């Protein structure tokens, strides 16, 4: 394990942390290239908390309270989203998955309302299915609904078309696979 990167916190004194800040900048630049997004944030705890923060961010962007959350998202990610939003006015509606293991996109389109803030999916999802969401993204943008895509396995971004190029508005992920395995 690399001891100098033992924390997810961004250093507060840039004058004594140039090396760490440079590493974070390089990481964010690479994340932008892999996700197809214009900007990236670092220093979230993990992919699950990043997804929860993305849901809260979507609400702040469009002031809507309904979220359609795919049941094909990793259960631990969904649990963290539920924990973060408990006690708020957020309405998390579970979207079923199909027999093929993908999110039921027809269900999403049928249940989309003017108060739907975002649709939340994971690709590849918990079952390993690469979601087909380009046409969904186009439909959502007409409604002003955001598309949040979670990427639990960052290495997949090396072979899949970036979520940003497929219509995702917000992309979150887990960066563990870029480093060493957990060592405790």
What are the language-model segments listed below?
Residues 49-184:
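Conserved PLP-enzyme active-site core in the AAT-like
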